[in-house]
UniProtKB/Swiss-Prot annotation:
GO term, biological process aspect, one: lipoprotein localization to outer membrane
Primary localization class, coarse: membrane
Domain ABC transporter per the UniProt entry, residue ranges: 6-227
Organism per entry: Jannaschia sp. (strain CCS1)
Subunit (UniProt): The complex is composed of two ATP-binding proteins (LolD) and two transmembrane proteins (LolC and LolE).
Lineage, uppermost ranks: Bacteria, Pseudomonadati, Pseudomonadota, Alphaproteobacteria, Rhodobacterales
EC number: 7.6.2.-
GO MF: ATP binding; ATP hydrolysis activity; transmembrane transporter activity
Function: Part of the ABC transporter complex LolCDE involved in the translocation of mature outer membrane-directed lipoproteins, from the inner membrane to the periplasmic chaperone, LolA. Responsible for the formation of the LolA-lipoprotein complex in an ATP-dependent manner.
UniProt gene name: lolD
Keywords: ATP-binding, Cell inner membrane, Cell membrane, Membrane, Nucleotide-binding, Translocase, Transport
Intrachain disulfide bonds: none
Name used for this protein in its record: Lipoprotein-releasing system ATP-binding protein LolD
Binding site residues for ATP: A43, P44, S45, G46, A47, G48, K49, S50
Transmembrane segments annotated in the record for this chain: none
Amino acid sequence: MSEFSLVLDDIQKSYNHGKANEINVLRGASTRIARGEIVGLIAPSGAGKSTLLQIAGLLDTADAGRVEIGGELVTGATDRARTAARRGKVGFVYQFHHLLPEFSAVENIVLPQLAHGVAAGEAEARALDLLGRVGMAARATHRPGELSGGEQQRVAFCRSLANAPALMLADEPTGNLDPATSDTVFDVLMELVRGTGLSALIATHNHELAARMDRVLRLDEGVLVSA
């Protein structure tokens, strides 16, 4: 097993390639995230944080460079292989929870497991375990509309870990919450990541939250540097 959950090597990405208005977003971004490591990612709006996360999470492709997830080289893989790697090895958390409103908290965590071929009983047991880890066991049967913003995001954290990924990618995971709730929910996120032993790359504008991670990277003119 690889010692790295994520390897990005010389990632390059531009838009409007070859045109007068070409925008070079990533100009050779490289990093390695070790198993169990939590890394912060900071940069101004429009600097390419979301683009980098989408490439790392196999939602987009780089123009050049190499991506490995959990020791698997995914650069140049077929669409089917990329989809399998994305579903099985990567968990996503966004600023807005995107929970399915017609399903309960536990069902929102069960569904991605069923899509991955997990038996219903096993999927429910894992979902309840994850909810218990974030203090949401008593709210398992509540739908998203019956939960507070902080509670909704806790469920979203659990859903991202439904299929036991090697890597969590989070894009401003507390950005939609008030400061007090943001701080509490971030503590929950850190405890969940630490408790499950996975790695995480977390983009945030909050430098105080970033400073609580193992290390912090900054996007500087399309290149990753230590902050």
